[in-house]
From Swiss-Prot:
Species, as recorded: Helicobacter pylori (strain Shi470)
Function description: Responsible for the release of ribosomes from messenger RNA at the termination of protein biosynthesis. May increase the efficiency of translation by recycling ribosomes from one round of translation to another.
Molecular function (Gene Ontology), one example: ribosomal large subunit binding
Name of the molecule in the record: Ribosome-recycling factor
GO CC terms, sorted: cytosol
Lineage: Bacteria, Pseudomonadati, Campylobacterota, Epsilonproteobacteria, Campylobacterales
Family designation: Belongs to the RRF family.
Segments passing through the bilayer: none
Classification via Pfam families: RRF
BP GO terms, sorted: cytoplasmic translational termination
Subcellular location: Cytoplasm
Primary localization: cytoplasm
The gene coding this protein: frr
Keyword line: Cytoplasm, Protein biosynthesis
Amino acid sequence: MLQAIYNETKDLMQKSIQALNRDFSTLRSAKVSVNILDHIKVDYYGTPTTLNQVGSVMSLDATTLQISPWEKNLLKEIERSIQEANIGVNPNNDGETIKLFFPPMTTEQRKLIAKDAKAMGEKAKVAVRNIRQDANNKIKKLEKDKEISEDESKKAQEQIQKITDEAIKTIDESVKNKEDAILKV
């Protein structure tokens, strides 16, 4: 019964860490990632659709991305969506593909993006702490219902705290690594 709570807690905390890493992939660092375009939607016959579902997106070098739509009639729509997304780049449409040339980041931009990474990390920590609180509430309910003793409850809550500390440590390391990657010139 307690093992199930531990496993569920670990699983939920791991999902929070995975969500943080997905969020990090949308932040720009020294090398531009195709994931920076993940949130951009294109109007595909009346349906908002992600870019990677209407064409291939690839990195040509550290500062250039190329979008090759599967249907050439989508070029203008993709171009419009990128401009509206306000990601700090103008699309270059050559009639076949769209190239995005990202200028090198200024020190100020790097600091702002690093600040965003830190905020994402704090959000993940809050999620982990909420998961800890839910697990502790389940343990307290078991104690209240006389399914476990007070000693077992205290030990279980200590175990949940250890799991939480590991998750927070992982988040802190991820944030530090991302900040280092962003601030590296």
